[in-house]
Amino acid sequence: EAANESDNYAPDANNSALIGKTFTLRSGSSGVLNHATQVGKRMYGTDGVGLAPGVTDINVYSAVGWTQSNYLRFGTGSNPSTPPGNIELFNNSWVASFGNFGYDNEVLARGDWAIDAHNVMMLNGVTTADEHVPLMCFGFNCVSVGASDGTHTSGTVPTGYHQAGMQVPLIVAAQGTTSNATGVVSAITALLVETRETHPNTSGNFFAGFSETMKAVLLTGGNHSNSWTNNPILSGPNRGRTNQPIDAIYGVGTANIDNSHRVLTGGQFASDTSTVGLGSAPTAGWDTTTLTNGQSKYIKFSVASLADEVSIVLTWHQQANTGFGSYSLADLNLELLHYNGGKPTSLTGDAGIGVFGSGNCISESEIDTVEHLYLKNLSAGEYVVKMSRSDSAAGARVCSLGWLFPEQDASVPGDLNGDGTVDVNDLLVIIAGWGVCSGECPADLSGDGLVDVSDILLLLSYWS
């Protein structure tokens, strides 16, 4: 919390919504600061005020103390301190700058190092001023947060910073200030942590506890408004490509606990270095894996009916080097491919026309640590997501992929006559419907408006 002129930075422990909470003041004694109280209420307040009322133990820092002696240790030759207890996340509902590129860059690098080394999440608010303020929202590894009304400062990080060109914010929330919006996103993250510890699909899963996993889960669930765009190329041979993974104002969209809960509890589904013999992933889920230089990994998806929207997010950490003056930068890319007869084929250009209505099938930023695919009206069929790495940094890099497809009916894909199996009777349905579709056309499995050999091939891939 940014302390006031009296050095007060603490929430009001006597506020009715905060009764029963234990506050540990890590930056020394403090009086009450209303800003801290209001943000805290939205995070962990009781009586229906906060989203995560089950949070009872809160460590409170002043912004100065947190960046300097109490945690990040800026101004010393030491690494950031180990967080006390079992801290999972830091909420930074403040902005600041030392007024010096070198100082600000070091603080940001210390924050990125701490996220990676201490396996924590940092939810950092962006400013509403006319110009960007770097601390702490410029961090590679953090989650930068804006307000869903778009009143925050947005766009790309300016020159002078290691992150120059990177997009901020990553996500927004429906609050009147970015401070409160950051608190809401922190509360959603806390709920996801609680779910992770108790749900049978994640409890005991080592990779579920990675901060990369939690970041991917959070971002994949963002709600995209009708005006949302990551500016994909709309026509020509590069239709479907973008090097701007997220919306310039709203990031991945508005944080949504229900969507992110689906992604998290869908569980981990392992990617593979080969496209041969892949099983189909669930409609929502995640994977946390590693990629080395030049390596690619794949996950297959079977889409039984037209998917009105699909969200896929890949994220990873950049590693701050010793001394916090530079980084080891990894560059990952993300692509959705058609899976025809067990062979991946590109959806860029004309190949994607009739397969997806709008959006991007390739995300290939050179600076962001998030790649995002967002497609509307994806036709029924089989697809693979390709994660790839193209840089010269040494060693393997942990990365996390989250995905969210529409929930599918319990019906068996390809079961056109509804008898629970895919067999010759379903083939007869395709033959009976051969040609151009008119009206409802269940035999058009590929969704291209024709019942033809492509539908037979797709049916055979579902054969019981």
Question: Whereabouts are the PLM-identified features?
Answer:
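Acidic glycine-/aspartate-rich tracts in secreted/extracellular proteins
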Residues: 2-6, 149-151, 223-226, 317-319, ...
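Short glycine/serine- and small hydrophobic-enriched flexible loop segments
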Residues: 41-45, 186-198, 220, 305, ...
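C-terminal edge strands of extracellular/lumenal beta-sandwich accessory domains
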Residues: 210, 214-215, 297-299, 335-341, ...
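Subtilisin-like serine protease catalytic core
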Residues: 1-71, 83-89, 99-103, 117-121, ...
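Secreted peptidase-domain scaffold signal
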Residues: 237-332, 338, 400-410
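Cellulosome-associated attachment modules in secreted, modular CAZymes
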Residues: 405-464
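Surface-exposed beta-strand/loop patches in noncatalytic accessory domains
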Residues: 327-367
